[in-house]
């Protein structure tokens, strides 16, 4: 019996060594020895959740800039702490007024969603409306974000009470005039915004492409007509806390929401409040992960902060989660935002594996597959594979950075957790993606 035990143990050990050798050879072939990654910093971790053992590791305990792979951690926090339906606001009715406590909900009046229960509630209110902002303790722009990207829609400012995704959506429509009176004036051009604004707007030179530029420190916009028949561009506005949002909401709502003073806040202390919910949490997380929506990610983390700490405090909630939920990570990460926009973020592939494993073991597998994009969807739309199921994962990319972490189905029909992080490369993201894709398809 003892001989049989040692024989089986030896076979299992040799089989494990053989598998690791095979994966090492494939990692060398497709990633580590490839000329496109010769100067890059690369980390690889492949983990079998069925026995909680690593199948392969290469520099997986090193720290990397994860870019949007941070959204995996934000997803974990949101699933753990946010209710099934997002908290839009807390509603407190006083004798002569209504006090609104914002919860950081990014879906309010966002064009992604058609129904907005909070807006309906505000519209039907018969008492004067007031809002508090003493639960906000976070900068509008994250630490380590690029200030040069202030005009880009992927870097909208964060706020306690977002409206319209904290973006102004601009539209250009060109059409041929039916009965032009001037042969040199045959085109009608209509440019408008959603929401409508009362901020300064000017016009720049006409160009081939419709373009809108906001002043860096002012909500003033310069529009350049394009030659497209129809075009659109979304531009972040300066939130000024919640002031800009309230200004935009005034026209949409037809009512003024005033900032609550200390006297009103004092009156509300002993009053019973109720929560107004908005969209389904998992719907927002799916959109966030499929298109890598930075605004949804950062606001989701702030909503988690409101649930845990009763205030929107990004540094504090990150420390709380690291201390109480992610204290078993093998290497302490540096985590600074919910989206991964910051280059200050640093995570190891081993840390990603740990979080992926927690997600898989805690939540329904079908839910995970709904939230994460698969090959051919969202940010994985360029990955092609004949199998109906091959990969569910999150990309992360910025200049010199490409990461991919998630779940991969091997040719033996086994789901594995994986994390591949590439930093300091000088190739294109598409080149790095194809190398990683080839490696994963070879497993």
Q: What kind of region is each of these model predictions?
A:
Residues 26-29, 193-198, 385-392:
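Short Pro/Gly-enriched beta-strand edge/turn motifs at strand-loop
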Residues 59-60, 112-115, 337-338:
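N-terminal post-signal-peptidase region of extra-cytosolic proteins
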Residues 80-331:
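Conserved serine DD-peptidase/penicillin-binding transpeptidase domain
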Residues 1-29:
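Bacterial Sec-dependent N-terminal signal peptides
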Residues 55-57, 276, 301-443:
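Small-residue-rich helix-loop
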Residues 18-63, 82-85, 120-127:
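Beta-lactamase-like hydrolase cores
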Residues 44-46, 89-92, 405:
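Short beta-strand scaffold segments in enzyme catalytic cores
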Residues 68-78, 219-226, 242-252, 284, ...:
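Active-site-proximal alpha-helical segments within enzyme catalytic domains
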